[in-house]
Amino acid sequence: MLAGAVALSALTLAFMPPVAGMTPAMMKSCALIVFTIGFWAVGALPEHLTGLLFFLIAMVFAIAPANVVFSGFESATLWLVLGGLIMAEAVNRTGLAQRLAVLMFDRYCDSYRHLVVAVVMAAIVLSFVMPATVGRVLLLVPIVIAAGERAGFAVGSRGYYGLTLAALMTTYQCGTGILPANAPNLVLAGAAETLYRLPLHYAEYLLWQFPVMGLVKGGLIILATWWFFPATASRVAAHAELPAMTSEQKRLTAILVLALVLWITDFAHGVKAGWVALAAGIACVLPRIGVMSYAAFNEVRFGAFFYVAATLGTGMLTQQSGLSAALGRGVDATLALQPGDDFRNFVLLSLFTTVAGVFTTNPAQPAVLAPLAQSFADVTGWPLKTALMTLAVGFSTMLLPHQVPPMMVGMQLAKLRYGAVLVMALPLAAIGLVALLPLQYAWWRLIGAFG
């Protein structure tokens, strides 16, 4: 039903007479963008399949030149996604992540509150070493469920919901403060590079976003879990004994540590995070050095690669077709942004970008809004980078689970009811917006983000 409505809306836009201020080419571009973003939003097809349809329709009907449609493939950010997918597969195959999870969780199974803290911290740590959000969800949720069972929490119990939701909320929301950790971050970085030739460096992004949207939000998730899903642990299993690390685990640890060091120091050596990730991914499958066979490479899930490429292509199409300029004028008039009123501008743009995620999904939000960043910067008087970074503040907040595809994957994996998830998601979003936006503004003011 919803998919049919989206398709009908797109067809109507494609064939109706141009509205005031629009050309026939702009109407066709708008129709394709509505189709693509709409199908992502309603989940009509797997995200990567919708992305491939975007490429196909754009080229068959000559909606835009190939260098616009496939612009995402020129971005180092897209290759960060590929490297991250390979590393995620390697982490799973070697058992390294399971080992880390046992080390982090087992000692805390005597206390529910301590176990919640351990789960949140583990999700944050994994965000640094495992770039794919879906991969972290698929890895962490079964381990958290097992840890919950060791602490006496049966499937469907209050403690079970608390632990699994803490893992899912942290995996996505705190991961938005770490550049390679989530798809929206990568789409934003790719859009900044392809649209404005403005690279977002790993360390710089970490400084701007992680202190508040990573660490402080992690603390907020812990408190929300304790409050909305209180429980008491009763250990039912003895402490686990870990075997010695395998040679594959040792080699993979070395690869991940080296990649992390190079990511953090990218401002010094100038090698983009994407090429570091790609090198690390290649190292994982090289003979002797690597930890995966050639055949295992074929089992890497490449869907996210084409999904991100399509989101970057939609962003470039929005800009090159002139739609971004028209949308920017409309948004500026609606929000009534004022030069010099930084706090008001910051709050309005953050709220706008947060709500936009409900209609576009959070991964697609930066693809849709990044082309408007220059307009936001011009009206507010901010540097372009600040306008772009404000988009990340918006997609770091999840109002509804369908905004975040990995969240939906985790809910299905853990068999969580949608309504029960909203019990925590909506209050957490409200508290986060009220408490964290002023704190984020103060932090950005301190580091000179507003010029």
Roles of regions detected by a PLM:
Residues 17-31, 74-86, 135-137, 212-217, ...:
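Structural signature of hydrophobic alpha-helical transmembrane segments
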Residues 37-46, 122-132, 168-179, 262-268, ...:
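Transmembrane alpha-helix interface/packing and boundary motifs in multi-pass membrane proteins
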